[in-house]
Amino acid sequence: MKPNFSKGLIPAIVIEEGTKEVLMLAYMNEDAYEKTLETKRTWFYSRSRQSLWNKGETSGNVQYVQSLYLDCDQDSIVVNVKQVGPACHTGEKTCFHYQII
């Protein structure tokens, strides 16, 4: 089974192995997905830079892929990772650290 990339990008929800805490949301195109499978590290597509990026390539805060899950429509993916260091570029463990309610 493979994601449906007919719209170009799919959301990739990254969760932490063990706790299942949501770490971040990014987007994958087919190339990022294939590189993620090949390297077992997360690759995403930057909408602002219009290019692929490897999480932790410059910061050292890498994500080692443990498993991948497709949703029922095959147009979004959950990436289960072993996180090294914080996931958020702000230095927070997760990008979802602002509580609203």
From Swiss-Prot:
Can you tell me which residues bind Zn(2+)? Answer: 72, 88, 95
Q: What class of enzyme is it?
A: hydrolase
Q: Which domain of life is it from?
A: Bacteria
Report a single Gene Ontology molecular function: zinc ion binding
Q: Where in the cell is it found?
A: Cytoplasm
Identify the Gene3D superfamilies for this entry.
Answer: Phosphoribosyl-AMP cyclohydrolase (3.10.20.810)
Give an example GO cellular component term for this record: cytoplasm
Q: How cofactor binds (record note)?
A: Binds 1 Mg(2+) ion per subunit.
Q: Which residues bind Mg(2+)?
A: 71, 73, 75
| Any Pfam family the entry gives | PRA-CH
What InterPro entries does the record point to? PRA-CH, PRib_AMP_CycHydrolase_dom, PRib_AMP_CycHydrolase_sf
**Which UniProt keywords are given for this protein, alphabetically ordered?**
Amino-acid biosynthesis, Cytoplasm, Histidine biosynthesis, Hydrolase, Magnesium, Metal-binding, Zinc
A single GO BP = L-histidine biosynthetic process
- Quote the function comment for this protein: Catalyzes the hydrolysis of the adenine ring of phosphoribosyl-AMP.
Tell me its family: Belongs to the PRA-CH family.
Indicate the quaternary assembly: Homodimer.
| Protein name per its UniProtKB record | Phosphoribosyl-AMP cyclohydrolase
Organism of provenance: Bacillus cereus (strain G9842)
